[in-house]
Amino acid sequence: MAVGHYDLKRTKNKQYYFNLKASNGEVILTSEMYTTKAAANKGIRSVQANSPAEKNFEIRENKSGKSYFVLKARNYQVIGISESYDNEVAVKKGIQSAIKHGSSVNVRDLTKSE
């Protein structure tokens, strides 16, 4: 069975973030920026803990009218944001993918190669 994974990355200005990726390599959601690697890893653990419950997802609409979803922690803080989708069916499929792959413990630390 193929599983998703997390890619932990660092920006040029030394901020950390992660992407949750599906087994096919597509980005499901992206985190906020973190000032430390430890904080980004804590964010990954929060996604792992909160993604199995559909109630933690919220569908929103951006300024151009496209749908996207956010994943919220128990304290209602947004811990991940999806890409934009053309319709509600597609955004719901994205949520199901996040539920399926979010509990993955496979974290690829791409900051080591920088």
Curated annotation (Swiss-Prot):
> What highest taxon heads this organism's lineage?
Bacteria
Residue runs in coiled coils: none
For this UniProt record, the keywords arranged alphabetically read as follows:
Repeat
The sequence repeat units are at 11-59, 62-110
Q: Does the keyword Repeat apply?
A: yes
What Pfam family is a match for this entry? DUF1508
The signal peptide annotation in the UniProt record is none
Q: What InterPro entries does the record point to?
A: DUF1508 (IPR010879), UPF0339_domain (IPR051141), YegP-like_sf (IPR036913)
Record's family? Belongs to the UPF0339 family. Duplicated subfamily.
Q: Which PANTHER family match?
A: PTHR40606, UPF0339 PROTEIN YEGP
Q: What is this protein called?
A: UPF0339 protein plu2779
Q: Which organism is it from?
A: Photorhabdus laumondii subsp. laumondii (strain DSM 15139 / CIP 105565 / TT01)
